[in-house]
């Protein structure tokens, strides 16, 4: 009976145990009195209750399987017909070992072959990288104000130059081909974004006031002494700083690209011919005439012009670096002498004390994108404030263009008033507080609440101070195969700056006009204390190179934008960003569409030639005083969406060009 009871218990085990006994017939027979290893089971359950469940934990399953008593005879096996157990006389370990041995031999051969192949491919790739011809597998794009400089930027990229190398060469080229807009005697700002690292830096090389410059001196004599308008040029220091940070080719080689343009000659652009024709004879020095009007008359578009003087200067800078410009050499002495001869107060010490600034751009999130722009004394915060205000309106394709234009006009009135309160934060700590307010979404909502949807405000919502910026500026926009984006805007302020030119051919800027002082303008606008004249200070600036990237992640739309036209450039950038990011228009259409700009001093709403009479009538019905002009500003751009890149110039510019590397 005891034997029958035991058999009955074993049959019950075979019938109700969840164990598949075909999987344990090769296990060795265990002594019946072997104690159960209960402690390890408890430890595993303590670690993870779910994995400790015998139905789910493979370790627990195997341990419980070892506790089952296996039949000891064939008769016992036969007495359990319902059991799935089968007797085996093979040595389970020897059979398994032989089978594993075979499998291991085959696996070893396969793994060895794969490793050998992979090693060979890796060695070949490394040798190709180090000894093969260099190759570029991605696209690139260049946009500048002159076709010759755009092609030069492409040339630098094709010779394995970095995006910043291309930007430096193209910017120096514009100082040669478009001397009315930019040059070695001016300054600017460059915004660089590294897509792979998702990092951005801004190089600020805006001109600074000479140490001996005083407000009362400017107020009394600025119209008769052009030398007073000359600030310490930052162009050479800024471009060299950018190259030190991001350059790939040697500095001398980058400058040699631009020097070749000056030496070999270039075709006079339509814009340069127009600017020279508009220069009044009394404003031209004899040296200026010899340089730009060798025949005694303004050159025609397309005529060939050589600048061997600038080629020589660039050769010197390529060999000696910025020290040749700032450290008291011949170039420094010439610039100081030229400015002082025309009533200026700039000194050699001002040049030696100058430094370019490397800082972070200001940023704001707009429609799922991060907009990056220069901080004060530049007006990037006002640009972001305009976008923050517009973001709260229901601007979709279903909203009429006329209604959208009204909202844009009222928003820009606020943004430009905010811009007039900015200046150099090094000299006024309240500017940082003003900047923070401009970047605030809460503040934007408050300002938006003061905009009437159907009627123009009869007077500015905020106090407006004197607004006057450089009307001419040169733009360079690069999206390189190295996954860098570069946006740069530079200027001499007025066309040809101060009109003063050194014996070496360097035109000097007139950037001190961007400061504010009493009774400077004909309409007697209130001067801005934040932008008052002080030694070493940098004046308010509307140079706004702007980069847009996805707010999250690396995939999506990137933009590089620039504009000229001073305050009108801020208005233009705002409307282009609105068209691309809110209304989902392509970049070409966004740049071509008509733009407006509220002139706060005259209380006129200026619109360009692209506006229809119906649109003008609608705006006038809303209370706007509309003035139609030919062109407000040029806004160029480049766009990258994933791996597709396009370069687009503003169609209003007769000379600008965009080119894409395929």
From Swiss-Prot:
<keyword id="KW-1133">Transmembrane helix</keyword>
<dbReference type="Pfam" id="PF01019">
    <property type="entry name" value="G_glu_transpept"/>
</dbReference>
<feature type="modified residue" description="Phosphoserine">
    <location>
        <position position="17"/>
    </location>
</feature>
<keyword id="KW-0325">Glycoprotein</keyword>
<feature type="glycosylation site" description="N-linked (GlcNAc...) asparagine">
    <location>
        <position position="519"/>
    </location>
</feature>
<feature type="glycosylation site" description="N-linked (GlcNAc...) asparagine">
    <location>
        <position position="283"/>
    </location>
</feature>
<comment type="similarity">
    <text>Belongs to the gamma-glutamyltransferase family.</text>
</comment>
<feature type="glycosylation site" description="N-linked (GlcNAc...) asparagine">
    <location>
        <position position="394"/>
    </location>
</feature>
<comment type="pathway">
    <text>Sulfur metabolism; glutathione metabolism.</text>
</comment>
<keyword id="KW-0012">Acyltransferase</keyword>
<dbReference type="GO" id="GO:0036374">
    <property type="term" value="F:glutathione hydrolase activity"/>
</dbReference>
<comment type="subunit">
    <text>Heterodimer composed of the light and heavy chains. The active site is located in the light chain.</text>
</comment>
<feature type="modified residue" description="Phosphoserine">
    <location>
        <position position="79"/>
    </location>
</feature>
<feature type="glycosylation site" description="N-linked (GlcNAc...) asparagine">
    <location>
        <position position="452"/>
    </location>
</feature>
<feature type="glycosylation site" description="N-linked (GlcNAc...) asparagine">
    <location>
        <position position="330"/>
    </location>
</feature>
<dbReference type="GO" id="GO:1902883">
    <property type="term" value="P:negative regulation of response to oxidative stress"/>
</dbReference>
<protein>
    <recommendedName>
        <fullName>Glutathione hydrolase 7</fullName>
        <ecNumber>3.4.19.13</ecNumber>
        <ecNumber>2.3.2.2</ecNumber>
    </recommendedName>
</protein>
<keyword id="KW-0472">Membrane</keyword>
<feature type="topological domain" description="Extracellular">
    <location>
        <begin position="128"/>
        <end position="662"/>
    </location>
</feature>
<dbReference type="InterPro" id="IPR029055">
    <property type="entry name" value="Ntn_hydrolases_N"/>
</dbReference>
<comment type="function">
    <text>Hydrolyzes and transfers gamma-glutamyl moieties from glutathione and other gamma-glutamyl compounds to acceptors.</text>
</comment>
<feature type="compositionally biased region" description="Low complexity">
    <location>
        <begin position="72"/>
        <end position="83"/>
    </location>
</feature>
<dbReference type="GO" id="GO:0103068">
    <property type="term" value="F:leukotriene C4 gamma-glutamyl transferase activity"/>
</dbReference>
<feature type="transmembrane region" description="Helical; Signal-anchor for type II membrane protein">
    <location>
        <begin position="107"/>
        <end position="127"/>
    </location>
</feature>
<feature type="region of interest" description="Disordered">
    <location>
        <begin position="26"/>
        <end position="90"/>
    </location>
</feature>
<dbReference type="GO" id="GO:0006751">
    <property type="term" value="P:glutathione catabolic process"/>
</dbReference>
<feature type="glycosylation site" description="N-linked (GlcNAc...) asparagine">
    <location>
        <position position="198"/>
    </location>
</feature>
<feature type="glycosylation site" description="N-linked (GlcNAc...) asparagine">
    <location>
        <position position="353"/>
    </location>
</feature>
<dbReference type="InterPro" id="IPR043137">
    <property type="entry name" value="GGT_ssub"/>
</dbReference>
<keyword id="KW-0735">Signal-anchor</keyword>
<dbReference type="InterPro" id="IPR000101">
    <property type="entry name" value="GGT_peptidase"/>
</dbReference>
<keyword id="KW-0808">Transferase</keyword>
<keyword id="KW-0317">Glutathione biosynthesis</keyword>
<feature type="modified residue" description="Phosphoserine">
    <location>
        <position position="72"/>
    </location>
</feature>
<feature type="topological domain" description="Cytoplasmic">
    <location>
        <begin position="1"/>
        <end position="106"/>
    </location>
</feature>
<keyword id="KW-0378">Hydrolase</keyword>
<dbReference type="InterPro" id="IPR043138">
    <property type="entry name" value="GGT_lsub_C"/>
</dbReference>
<dbReference type="GO" id="GO:0005886">
    <property type="term" value="C:plasma membrane"/>
</dbReference>
<dbReference type="GO" id="GO:1901750">
    <property type="term" value="P:leukotriene D4 biosynthetic process"/>
</dbReference>
<keyword id="KW-0865">Zymogen</keyword>
<feature type="glycosylation site" description="N-linked (GlcNAc...) asparagine">
    <location>
        <position position="586"/>
    </location>
</feature>
<keyword id="KW-0812">Transmembrane</keyword>
């Amino acid at each position: 009976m005891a034997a029958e009871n035991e058999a009955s218990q074993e049959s019950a085990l075979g019938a109700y145990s969840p164990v598949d006994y075909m999987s344990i017939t090769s296990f060795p027979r265990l002594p019946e009195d072997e104690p159960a290893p209960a402690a390890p089971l408890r430890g595993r359950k303590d670690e993870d209750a779910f994995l400790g469940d015998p139905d789910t934990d493979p370790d627990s399953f195997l341990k419980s399987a070892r506790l089952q008593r296996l039949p000891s005879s064939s008769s016992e096996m036969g007495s359990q017909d319902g059991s799935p157990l089968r007797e085996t006389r093979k040595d389970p370990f020897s059979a398994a070992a032989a089978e594993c041995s075979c499998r291991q031999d085959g696996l070893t051969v396969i793994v060895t072959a794969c490793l050998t192949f992979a090693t060979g491919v890796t060695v070949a790739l490394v040798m190709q990288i180090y000894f093969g011809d260099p190759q570029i597998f991605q696209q690139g794009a260049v946009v500048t104000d002159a076709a010759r400089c755009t092609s030069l930027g492409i040339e630098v990229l094709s010779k394995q130059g970095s995006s910043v190398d291309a930007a430096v060469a193209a910017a120096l080229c514009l100082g040669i081909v478009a001397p009315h807009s930019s040059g070695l005697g001016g300054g600017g700002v460059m915004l660089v974004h590294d897509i792979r690292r998702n990092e951005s830096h801004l190089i600020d090389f805006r001109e600074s006031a000479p140490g001996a410059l005083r407000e009362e001196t400017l107020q009394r004599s600025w119209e008769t002494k052009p030398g007073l308008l000359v600030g310490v040029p930052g162009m050479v220091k800024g471009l060299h700083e950018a190259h030190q940070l991001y350059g790939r080719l040697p500095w001398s080689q980058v400058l040699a690209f631009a020097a070749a343009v000056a030496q070999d000659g270039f075709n006079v652009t339509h814009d340069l011919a127009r600017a020279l024709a508009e220069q009044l004879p009394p404003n031209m020095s004899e040296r200026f005439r010899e340089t730009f009007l060798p025949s005694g008359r303004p050159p025609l578009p397309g005529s060939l012009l050589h600048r061997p003087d600038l080629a020589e200067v660039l050769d010197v800078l390529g060999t000696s670096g910025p020290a040749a410009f700032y450290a008291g050499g011949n170039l420094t002495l010439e610039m100081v002498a030229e400015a002082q001869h025309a009533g200026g107060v700039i000194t050699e010490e001002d040049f030696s004390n100058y430094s370019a600034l490397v800082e972070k751009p200001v940023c704001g999130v707009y429609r799922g994108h991060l907009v990056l722009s220069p901080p004060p004394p530049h007006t990037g915060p006002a640009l972001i404030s305009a976008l923050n205000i517009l973001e709260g309106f229901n601007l979709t394709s279903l909203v009429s263009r006329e209604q959208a234009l009204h909202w844009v006009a009222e928003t820009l009135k606020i943004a430009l008033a905010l811009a007039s309160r900015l200046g150099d934060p090094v000299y006024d700590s309240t500017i940082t507080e003003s900047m923070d307010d401009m970047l605030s979404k809460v503040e934007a909502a408050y300002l938006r609440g003061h905009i009437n949807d159907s009627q123009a405000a009869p007077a500015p919502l905020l106090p407006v101070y004197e607004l006057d910026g450089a009307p001419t500026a040169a733009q360079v926009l690069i999206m390189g195969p190295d996954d860098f984006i570069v946006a740069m805007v530079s200027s001499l302020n007025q066309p040809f700056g101060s009109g003063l030119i050194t014996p070496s051919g360097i035109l000097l800027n007139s950037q001190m006009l961007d400061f504010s002082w009493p009774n400077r303008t004909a309409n007697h606008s209130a001067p801005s204390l934040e932008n008052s004249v002080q030694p070493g200070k940098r004046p308010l600036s509307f140079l706004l190179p702007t980069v847009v990237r996805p707010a999250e992640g690396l995939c999506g739309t990137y933009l590089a934008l620039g504009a000229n036209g001073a305050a009108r450039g801020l208005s233009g950038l705002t409307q282009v960003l609105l068209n691309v990011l809110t209304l989902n228009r392509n970049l070409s259409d966004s740049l071509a569409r008509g733009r407006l700009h509220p002139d706060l001093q005259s209380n006129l709403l200026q619109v360009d030639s692209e506006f229809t009479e119906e649109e003008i009538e609608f705006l006038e019905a809303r209370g706007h005083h509309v003035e139609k002009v030919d062109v407000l500003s040029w806004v160029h751009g480049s766009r990258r969406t994933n791996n597709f890149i396009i370069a687009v110039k503003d169609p209003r510019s007769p000379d600008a060009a965009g080119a894409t590397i395929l």
